[in-house]
C-alpha cells in the first residue's frame, strides 16, 4: 500500500472507530470527549481525532507490529469516526471482534480524496485485496478534502477537512476553543 500510494512511513494511517471504540481506547479530558460526542452524535459529522491511547486495549493489541508502528505515533493514534454507513459498520464489526482495522484513503498521497471508484488511480486499486464501488461517497467536495483531523490534547488542526468550518464553529460556540487561532499560533 505504501509503495502504491507513494505514502511516507512518517505519516501514520488512521484507525476505524466509533463512539464506543473511542471511549475504550482514547485517553482524553472530559471536555475533549464531550467535543467528540457533540460533533459526531449531535451534529452527525465525520471526525478524525488524534489522542493518547490505551496500548493494552484488546483492539490496539490486535494490531500486528508493522500495523501498530504505522498507525500510532508518539503514544497517539488517529481514529476516524462517523464517516458514513459502510465505515460505521466496519467499525462496529472491529469493535465486536476486538480487531483493529487500519486504513488510508484510496488515492496517491497528497493528491486529494477520491469520491467515486473510477477516480481512484489504477496503481492504488491494483494492490487492494478487495474493492467496493460504493458510488458517490458522503461529503464529496470539489477540493478533494477528506476528514478534518484534530489533536484532542493541543486542539491543533492536523488536517483541514471537508466540514472543518462547521467543526470550528461548533467547538468555538460550545466550548470557547478557537481551533483556527490555536493552529495559527503554532505556525
Residue ranges and their predicted role:
Residues 1-187:
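Active-site-adjacent structural elements in enzyme catalytic cores
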Amino acid at each position: 500500500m505504501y509503495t502504491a500510494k507513494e505514502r511516507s512511513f512518517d505519516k501514520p494511517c488512521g484507525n476505524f472507530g466509533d463512539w464506543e471504540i473511542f471511549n475504550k481506547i482514547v485517553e482524553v479530558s472530559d471536555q475533549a470527549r464531550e467535543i467528540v460526542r457533540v460533533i459526531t452524535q449531535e451534529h452527525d459529522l465525520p471526525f478524525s481525532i488524534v489522542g493518547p491511547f490505551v496500548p493494552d486495549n484488546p483492539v490496539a493489541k490486535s494490531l500486528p507490529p508493522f500495523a501498530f508502528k504505522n498507525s500510532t505515533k508518539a503514544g497517539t493514534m488517529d481514529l476516524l469516526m462517523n464517516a458514513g454507513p459502510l465505515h460505521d459498520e466496519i467499525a462496529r464489526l472491529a469493535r465486536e471482534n476486538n480487531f483493529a482495522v487500519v486504513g488510508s484513503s484510496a488515492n496517491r498521497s497528497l493528491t486529494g480524496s477520491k469520491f467515486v471508484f473510477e477516480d481512484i488511480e489504477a496503481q492504488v486499486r491494483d494492490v487492494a485485496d478487495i474493492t467496493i464501488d460504493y458510488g458517490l461517497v458522503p461529503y464529496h467536495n470539489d477540493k478533494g478534502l477528506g476528514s478534518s483531523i484534530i489533536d484532542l490534547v493541543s486542539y491543533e488542526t492536523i488536517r483541514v477537512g471537508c466540514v472543518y468550518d462547521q467543526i470550528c464553529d461548533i467547538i468555538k460556540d460550545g466550548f470557547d476553543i478557537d481551533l483556527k487561532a490555536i493552529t495559527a499560533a503554532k505556525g
